[in-house]
């Protein structure tokens, strides 16, 4: 199958001026857009038809040619080509600049690429580009060296002349002063007059001296500057530069602005520079080496690929097609235009003015100013606001530049390429459809008609209800009666997709078979609400229609709701009875002592009662009113399987349908068991929600999905039926306040008063008082709760609802009827005054306000949490999107050890509580062997519940399982390492996008995690929990309360100072001691297991193992990586993330977290490059690193040395090989800048890249191995296809040609291209 846009990779690079001119269809010379009278584009303007193509199909500008027959002609009057108007979306123009400008991305990005290339500081670069300083581009060293002595002599002569002049002037002035004084003396002037004259004379002489000295200093400065003149040197002083040019102009050239940068790049020798930098890296140290490494990255980029650094300085600016920056007329004659037109107009205006000034031969200062303005306008066009104040439009709004069009949520990448709107879709409010089967949904008639319109129209024409498509369309629009019959027919067997936003995991979109319903609301099956997280308080859902046969097949086979009963996160069923259904089944299976028609054994005076020969007889008795559903009876059963223990006792060969046995149970329970599959053992207990969950779990593990779907549907129907009959309602009368409440409160109030008195006397400090009060009132609340529980009758509806597990919990009941108890303030501390009223009695004003405090915090928290959790999911999806199952088995021997059970001192095994999320659904990596060496289960076997039970029975407590952490696949993971797909219960299929499933499984419960950081005991010691902790782990940040870990195994020496601990570890192997000092006493020492088995705080002389934590808090994952290596840090991260989710009662399988952690440790940082191409300090994929090293070693070279790095998910997503994926994630401009300089090529292997370019994603059924399937007929089919029909068919058909009628052996013919 061929793709429409079939290309293998996508490359990005720097465009040179020649490229830009080649793309262009003409130069834009005028800033005009359209003529305000005729509303036609101006010639040579930004919308010119001559450059960009005609505005109307097949019409030139002047109207000489109108019609398709002139296609391709260029009109000789107006120069417009006669073609489609669509070309205005793809034809580009350009602006020839009168002076070169630099591209702001490469100059202003951090780090400045231009600065690194030319070895100039960004500040200096800015001065040069924006005409604040001159830069020396070239010095003629040889000439200067040869003539230096002559020039020096000239300089000496000049200085001598200045000095002589100075001496002569001073001499003359001194003589004049003498003469003046003599004259004054002769006139007999006063002494102060004489003094003034003398002072004046001396002052003038001082000025003469200073002026001469300044002149000499300037000559010195000019000379020293000249002798030390070197390329890339900045001269900020304009006067100094002028003097240099006047005197020594022939020895050097200098310039300012982008032209000087262009010259520097032209003269730049990339090869030599790269060699120098490599040398510096080999021999250098410290800062110098770091700088060289960073520069080499940029220099080497230009050295290896076809990019020319000249692309960073532009001589021409491309103009994007006019349809991509449209101008639209609003009503009222005004125009709305894209900001780009404004930005382009500024560039053109300034460029034209600059051309004119140059032609006029204007003074350099004016020309330079205009060039600076041109540079600024091009900067604003590419990235407005990156440098200086942004250019604003009307209303002081910054204009959106080309970069802004790509960036952020509203940018091209995320808004248009990754989030397109879809045709054949609709949305409406949802209501419950309890009569539906699990795989059905109710679709409003009108909606269905609109969605299936083309199908209906075609069918109407086929059935001759309409002559042509047009009349069929009219029929549909007028909703003629025949249309509905046809719609029924078209809609059959055509699944539709339902989606509820926010789609947090893949079960947010499921396929259903539509059933037409009246009204305008979509009807949704009650059991799928859990997966969609939908309720019927006004939620809306969207409907999408899969069109192609493949899409319909996928929807039916993979997405049908009855095939998606299990959660992809934990493998537990999601389609479970909830709420009313649970209540109904709980009611049905309750047994009530002494109810009507109860079984009574035979006594002397009366026969036995309540014994029935079959369930049917019991039901008849119930219908007569002689028996209650919940009464205990004895009944003979033939169609229900006895419980396992009983079956073994009664039937040696096992039970078969039809064999009779007697059960002591209730009619309700018999009816419940009739809903289950026939071979499922009888369950004789009350159906709490947990029990129902256990049963469905069991069914999912043992029966095909179809059976499970049918069973849950039956349970739903029975649940609703009996919930209605049970008459469970809630009214005010059901909320009973316990009578002993007041007495309990008075007792505790007295205790609290005692504490308060102690506090007033100063016997307690504030904290102690608060803690005591909190303790007292917590006890009080608990006691009221107990009293409440004893006071309520068992058949109270509220208690029934809570006890059955339908909804609510006991705390809520206590709040309603008992007392609310203590509440927290926004800091999370308890307010020591309790709320003594219940909601039934009503709160006092003070209590009400205390209560609102915490409640509002809760609401604000939820809103923040939703946003944070969504962002976490987005980062997780981005980092893991290219983890796809690529092969069946990577053949690795490695795996990880998981615990199945805890071995007790007496040798018995207690099943580990976390088996469900660790060992379950994995593949064994080695044979599981019991104590006697017998193989219980061989390697490669899948660990389901039965297998785990078998291992525990054999006394095995540890097994080694395959894991994605140890998978050896180069790209993606293999099916055996991943193990069973949680959603299907079978080995994962090749092509499954396990990365995205993992991200969704971790992100979806994110909203349930708390935002808060808890305060637990101790001073100032916060335990970060909830969402912040998960983010901290996945971003690989240093934790907030970092705890040191032991670098080596050894004995601890602990010293206590005033404010700090100092811990020294003496290693067991006699190595160097490891010292940890300055450990703050605000963190407590860790509780560890001592060698004698007791637990206690770490103390002097204890023994610690490598990697043990020494203080309370969280270990820094980077430290764990350094001390214990990559495998340990992976296990550490998985464990820590699980801790957070388990604390919230969320069940996620370890394998999902492992997929993400695997992505965090994919890279290696190069320490020494050896004979490879890698740059030291660069990050490389582990697979690439290993294959390159193998290649070099095979050639006899020195391999590279590297160490694994742990990257946070954001950093890992940005470091991906695919620049398209990284650019559409975050920091778009930075990613594109880097990719362009390195001339990066995108192999299009991940999902996002393919979505962006509009190809099918390489996952699921879009993976190559499924799309390149060819159907080859079998021998029989070929024989059938190629025989000649015989005459007995009553058809006369002559023989064609000389063939015998035998099958043609197609295998002998090549299928290659016949050319």
UniProtKB/Swiss-Prot annotation:
Binds 1 Mg(2+) ion per subunit. Binds 2 Zn(2+) ions per subunit. Mg(2+) binds at residues 535, 537, 539. One of its GO terms (cellular component) is DNA-directed RNA polymerase complex. Zn(2+) 2 binds at residues 890, 967, 974, 977. It is an enzyme of class 2 (transferase). SMART domains: RPOLA_N (SM00663). InterPro entries: DNA-dir_RpoC_beta_prime, DNA-dir_RpoC_beta_prime_bact, RNA_pol_asu, RNA_pol_N, RNA_pol_Rpb1_1, RNA_pol_Rpb1_3, RNA_pol_Rpb1_3_sf, RNA_pol_Rpb1_4. Disulfide bonds: none annotated. One of its GO terms (biological process) is DNA-templated transcription. Its EC number is 2.7.7.6. Keywords: DNA-directed RNA polymerase, Magnesium, Metal-binding, Nucleotidyltransferase, Transcription, Transferase, Zinc. Its cofactor is Mg(2+); Zn(2+). Zn(2+) 1 binds at residues 60, 62, 75, 78. GO terms for molecular function: DNA binding; DNA-directed RNA polymerase activity; magnesium ion binding; zinc ion binding. CDD domains: RNAP_beta'_C (cd02655), RNAP_beta'_N (cd01609). The RNAP catalytic core consists of 2 alpha, 1 beta, 1 beta' and 1 omega subunit. When a sigma factor is associated with the core the holoenzyme is formed, which can initiate transcription. NCBIfam families: PRK14906.1, rpoC_TIGR. Belongs to the RNA polymerase beta' chain family. DNA-dependent RNA polymerase catalyzes the transcription of DNA into RNA using the four ribonucleoside triphosphates as substrates. This is DNA-directed RNA polymerase subunit beta'. It comes from Mycobacterium sp. (strain KMS).
């Amino acid at each position: 199958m061929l793709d429409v846009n079939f290309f293998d990779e996508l490359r990005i690079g720097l465009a040179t001026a020649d490229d830009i001119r080649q793309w262009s269809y003409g130069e834009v010379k005028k800033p005009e857009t359209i003529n305000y009278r005729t509303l036609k584009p101006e010639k040579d303007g930004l919308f010119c038809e001559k450059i960009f193509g005609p505005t109307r199909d097949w019409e030139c500008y002047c109207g000489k040619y109108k019609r398709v027959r002139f296609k391709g002609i260029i009109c000789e009057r107006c120069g417009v080509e006669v073609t489609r108007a669509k070309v205005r979306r793809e034809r580009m123009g350009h602006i020839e600049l009168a002076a070169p400008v630099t591209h702001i991305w490469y100059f202003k990005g951090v780090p400045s690429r231009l600065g690194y290339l030319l070895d100039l500081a960004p500040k200096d670069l800015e001065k040069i580009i924006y005409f604040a300083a001159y830069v020396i581009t070239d010095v003629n060293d040889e000439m200067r060296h040869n003539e230096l002595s002559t020039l020096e002599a000239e300089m000496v002569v000049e200085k001598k002349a200045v000095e002589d002049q100075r001496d002569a002037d001073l001499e003359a002035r001194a003589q004049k002063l003498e003469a003046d004084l003599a004259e004054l003396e002769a006139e007999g002037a006063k002494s102060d007059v004489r003094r003034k004259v003398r002072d004046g004379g001396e002052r003038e002489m001082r000025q003469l001296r200073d002026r001469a000295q300044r002149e000499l200093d300037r000559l010195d400065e000019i000379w020293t500057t000249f002798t030390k003149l070197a390329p890339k040197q900045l001269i900020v002083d304009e006067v100094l530069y002028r003097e240099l040019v006047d005197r020594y102009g022939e020895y050097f050239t200098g310039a300012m602005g982008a032209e000087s940068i262009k010259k520097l790049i032209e003269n730049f020798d990339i090869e030599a520079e790269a060699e120098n930098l490599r040398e510096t890296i080999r021999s250098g140290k410290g800062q110098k080496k770091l700088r060289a490494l960073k520069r080499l990255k940029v220099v080497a980029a230009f050295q290896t690929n076809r990019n020319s650094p000249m692309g960073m300085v532009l001589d021409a600016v491309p103009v994007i097609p006019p349809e991509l920056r449209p101008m639209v007329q609003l009503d009222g004659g005004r125009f709305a235009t894209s900001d780009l037109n404004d930005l382009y107009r500024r560039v053109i205006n300034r460029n034209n003015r600059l051309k004119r000034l140059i032609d006029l031969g204007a003074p350099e200062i004016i020309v330079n100013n205009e060039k600076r303005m041109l540079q600024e306008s091009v900067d604003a066009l590419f990235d407005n606001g990156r440098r200086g104040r942004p250019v604003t439009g009307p209303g002081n709004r910054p204009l959106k530049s080309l970069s802004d069009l790509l960036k952020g949520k509203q940018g091209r990448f995320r808004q248009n390429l990754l989030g397109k709107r879809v045709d054949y879709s609709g949305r409406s409010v949802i209501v419950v459809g309890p009569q539906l089967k699990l795989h059905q949904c109710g679709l409003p008639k009108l909606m269905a008609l609109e969605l299936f319109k083309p199908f209906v129209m075609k069918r109407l024409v086929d059935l001759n209800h309409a002559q042509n498509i047009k009349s069929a369309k009219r029929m549909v629009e007028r909703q003629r009666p025949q249309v509905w019959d046809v719609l029924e027919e078209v809609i059959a067997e055509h699944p539709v997709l339902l989606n509820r936003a926010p789609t947090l995991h893949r079960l947010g979109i499921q396929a259903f078979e539509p059933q037409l319903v009246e009204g305008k609301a979509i009807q949704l099956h009650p059991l799928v609400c859990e997966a969609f997280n939908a309720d019927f308080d006004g939620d809306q859902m969207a409907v999408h229609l899969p069109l192609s046969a493949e899409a319909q097949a996928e929807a039916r086979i993979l997405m049908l709701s009855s095939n998606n009963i299990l959660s992809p996160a934990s493998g537990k069923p999601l389609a479970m009875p909830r709420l009313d259904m649970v209540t109904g089944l709980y009611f049905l299976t309750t047994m009530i002592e002494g109810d009507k028609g109860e079984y009574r054994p035979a006594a002397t005076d009366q026969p036995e009662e309540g014994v029935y020969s079959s369930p049917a007889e019991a039901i008849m008795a119930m219908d007569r009113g002689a028996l209650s559903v919940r009464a205990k009876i004895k009944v003979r059963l033939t169609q229900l399987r006895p419980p396992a223990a009983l079956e073994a006792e009664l039937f040696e060969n096992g039970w078969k349908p039809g064999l009779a046995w007697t059960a002591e149970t209730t009619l309700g329970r018999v009816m419940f068991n009739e809903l289950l599959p026939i071979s499922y053992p009888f369950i004789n207990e009350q159906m709490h929600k947990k029990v129902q969950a256990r049963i469905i779990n069991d069914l999912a593990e043992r029966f095909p999905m179809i059976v499970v779907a049918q069973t849950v549907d039956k349970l739903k129907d029975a649940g609703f039926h009996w919930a209605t009959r049970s008459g469970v309602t809630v009214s005010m009368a059901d909320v009973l306040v316990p009578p002993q409440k007041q007495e309990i409160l008075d007792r505790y109030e007295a205790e609290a008063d005692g504490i308060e008195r102690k506090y007033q006397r100063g016997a307690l400090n504030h904290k102690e008082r608060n803690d005591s009060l909190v303790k007292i009132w917590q006890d009080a609340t608990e006691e009221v709760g107990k009293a409440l529980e004893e006071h309520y009758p068992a058949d109270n509806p509220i208690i029934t609802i809570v006890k059955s597990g339908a909804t609510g919990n006991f705390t809520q009941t206590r709040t309603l009827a008992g007392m609310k108890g203590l509440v927290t303030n926004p800091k999370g501390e308890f307010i020591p005054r309790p709320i003594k009223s219940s909601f039934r009695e009503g709160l006092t004003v003070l209590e009400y306000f205390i209560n609102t405090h915490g409640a509002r915090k809760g609401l604000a928290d939820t809103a923040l949490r939703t946003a944070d959790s969504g962002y976490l999911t987005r980062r997780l999806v981005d980092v893991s999107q290219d983890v796809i199952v690529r092969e069946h088995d990577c053949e690795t021997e490695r795996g990880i050890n998981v615990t199945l059970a805890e071995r007790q001192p007496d040798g018995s095994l207690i099943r580990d509580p976390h088996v469900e999320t660790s060992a379950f659904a994995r593949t064994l990596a080695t044979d599981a062997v019991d104590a006697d060496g017998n193989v219980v289960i061989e390697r490669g076997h899948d660990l389901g519940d039965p297998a785990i039970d078998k291992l525990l029975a054999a006394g095995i407590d540890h097994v080694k399982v395959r894991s994605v952490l140890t998978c050896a696949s180069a790209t993606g993971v293999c099916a055996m390492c991943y193990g069973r797909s949680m959603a299907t219960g079978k080995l994962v299929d090749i092509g499954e996008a396990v990365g995205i499933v993992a991200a969704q499984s971790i992100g979806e419960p994110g909203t349930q995690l708390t935002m808060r950081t808890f305060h637990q005991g101790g001073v100032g010691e916060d335990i970060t929990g909830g969402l912040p902790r998960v983010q901290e782990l996945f971003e690989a940040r240093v934790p907030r309360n970092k705890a040191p870990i032991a670098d080596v195994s050894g004995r601890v020496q602990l010293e206590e100072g005033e404010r700090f601990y100092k811990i020294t570890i003496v290693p067991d192997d006699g190595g160097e001691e490891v010292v940890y000092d300055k450990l703050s006493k605000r963190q407590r020492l860790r509780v560890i297991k001592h060698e004698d088995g007791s637990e206690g705080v770490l103390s002097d002389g204890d023994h610690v193992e490598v990697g043990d934590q020494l203080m309370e808090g969280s270990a820094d994952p980077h430290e764990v990586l350094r001390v214990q290596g990559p495998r340990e840090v992976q296990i550490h991260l998985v464990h820590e993330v699980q801790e957070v989710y388990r604390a919230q009662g969320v069940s996620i399988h370890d394998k999902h977290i492992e997929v993400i952690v695997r992505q965090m440790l994919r890279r290696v940082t190069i320490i020494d490059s050896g004979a490879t191409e890698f740059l030291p300090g660069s990050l490389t994929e582990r697979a690439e690193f290993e294959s390159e090293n193998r290649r070099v070693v095979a050639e006899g070279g020195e391999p590279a040395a590297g160490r694994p790095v742990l990257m946070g998910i954001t950093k890992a997503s940005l470091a991906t090989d695919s620049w398209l994926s990284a650019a559409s994630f975050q920091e778009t401009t930075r990613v594109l800048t880097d990719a362009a300089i390195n001339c990066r090529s995108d192999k299009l292997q991940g999902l996002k890249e393919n979505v962006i370019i509009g190809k099918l994603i390489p996952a699921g059924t879009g993976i190559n191995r499924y799309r390149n399937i060819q159907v080859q007929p079998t021998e029989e089919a070929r024989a059938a296809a190629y025989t000649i029909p015989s005459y007995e068919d009553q058809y006369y058909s002559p023989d064609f040609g000389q063939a015998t009628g035998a099958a043609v052996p197609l295998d002998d013919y090549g299928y290659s291209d016949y050319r």
